[in-house]
Structures are given as structure tokens and as C-alpha cells.
Amino acid sequence: VLVIGAGPSGTIAAAMIKNAGLETMIVEKLKFPRFVIGESLLPRCMEALEEAGLLDAVKAKGFQEKFGAKFVMNNGDVCDFNFSENFTDGYTWTWQVPRAEFDKTLADACESKGIPVHYETEVIDIQIR
């Protein structure tokens, strides 16, 4: 199974495919680490990382733990979210991550599971027969 993109969705998908007993590989058009935004994870991400078998690799990096979020509106109103109030089932915390390092950690963990990651490889055409 070919997975296009080595970001979090691609690496988690590839790890789950491998866990299901299928062969897979990832192609990524850029070289890692690379700049990308989106540092704020949500607790629901933790279950996907755990199911994919990638949670321990991320834990080992020692990223900053995050237990909630605060938003200050233009009018000064404050909106606090405490993840322990269980807006969803499961984890009550997550991490704040530097995305370049986070994505590289996930890709490296996939490679350690035997999933080839081909960097600087761009998909330019697909033919389905």
C-alpha cells in the first residue's frame, strides 16, 4: 500500500497498515526535518498514536505536556478549555510539539517498524487500471 505524505496522517496510516499485516511504504516530496505549522495537538490524537504503535516514540522525545487551552477574543472575553473536563472520551492531556521534530519522530518510528520512507519523492501521476 502506497502512502503519499509523511506528515502525521500519513505516518499514522502507514503504521496502522503495517500493524494489519500489509506491506506499505511512504513517499514524501520534501526532505525532513522541514518547516510546517500546526503544533497544537488535541487529546483525540493520542488514541491514534497509541493504536498505530507510535506513542512511545513520541513520549521519548519529552515534548511539553498540554492539559488545556485558552483563547482570548478580540473583545477581551476569555474561553478556557480544560481537557480533563472530558469533551471527548479518552486522554485528558496531549503535547505541544515543534512540528518539524514531531513529524520526523513519527517518520523515524515508521522506518524502525520496517516501513520505507522515500524522501524527496514526488507523486506526479497515478494511473488506475
Give the predicted meaning of each segment:
Residues 34-75:
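N-terminal FAD cofactor-binding segment of flavoenzymes
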Residues 2, 18-37:
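Glycine-rich FAD pyrophosphate-binding loop
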Residues 30, 41, 100:
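Anionic group-transfer/hydrolysis microenvironments
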Residues 10-11:
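N-terminal Rossmann-fold NAD(P) dinucleotide-binding loop
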